[in-house]
Each structure stands twice: as structure tokens, then as C-alpha cells.
UniProtKB/Swiss-Prot annotation:
UniProt: heme b binding residues: H88
GO biological process, one term: hydrogen peroxide catabolic process
Cited Pfam families: Globin
Protein's recorded name: Hemoglobin subunit alpha-1
Lineage: Eukaryota, Metazoa, Chordata, Craniata, Vertebrata
Globin domain mapped to chain residues: 2-142
Subunit relationships: Heterotetramer of two alpha chains and two beta chains.
Amino acid sequence: MVLSADDKSNVKAAWGKVGGNAGEFGAEALERMFLGFPTTKTYFPHFDLSHGSAQVKAHGKKVGDALTLAVGHLDDLPGALSNLSDLHAHKLRVDPVNFKLLSHCLLSTLAVHLPNDFTPAVHASLDKFLSTVSTVLTSKYR
């Protein structure tokens, strides 16, 4: 999926409002995913998955950092996320559907925290962005 100039602008503006909260939002999205889609917990058997867990917060920071990296490289997402794609495809072997589930939870989290900025256009742009990130992360599965 190709991001238009407007999409890129919307994504950068929305992520700019996330600011230093990317890790917290990532952790919240993970918690939403674990609650809404319990089968996703199987990829984290060694984690304490309770609310506020240090392990979920640490992984949420990784998610937030990866998305911040992606926002900074909207014109070269495959290059920016290549190592992460390798990790998830070859070492962790995460089922690709889980990226869609996490994307849904990220959109919900952003909508809750940025209600005035989460317009239909921004929602659509963020959805396209997260879909593109998911596609890049699963590209090495083939």
C-alpha cells in the first residue's frame, strides 16, 4: 500500500503528538491485544502479562521505538525495518495475523489518547501506515 503525501503528513503529525509517550502507548496497545486476543499471549510465555508489568512496558517501548523509526523513514520502510522483519520471520516466527491485531489495538490506543486529532483522515492514514508496516514486517516470511 502506497502512502500519499497527505498520508505521510498525517502520520508524521499524529506521531509528533505521541511524542515521548510512544513506549507507553505501545505497552497499552499490547495490553489491549492480550485482553482482546488472548491467543497472542502464546508468543510471550516468559512474560508477566499483568497490567503494568515491567516486561510489557519494556516490549511496548520496543514497539514504540520501531514505529518511531518507521515514521522517520516513510520513504524506505523496507530498509528501515529489515532487521526487525528478519527477527520476527526467522527467529520469533510470529504469525503474520498478529501484526494486524496489534495494529488494531494501536489505532484504538491512539484514538483514546488523541481524540481531538484522530480525525477520519488521520485514522485512515494511520491505518494505511500500520498496514504498510505489517506488510514490511511479514515480507521475509515468503
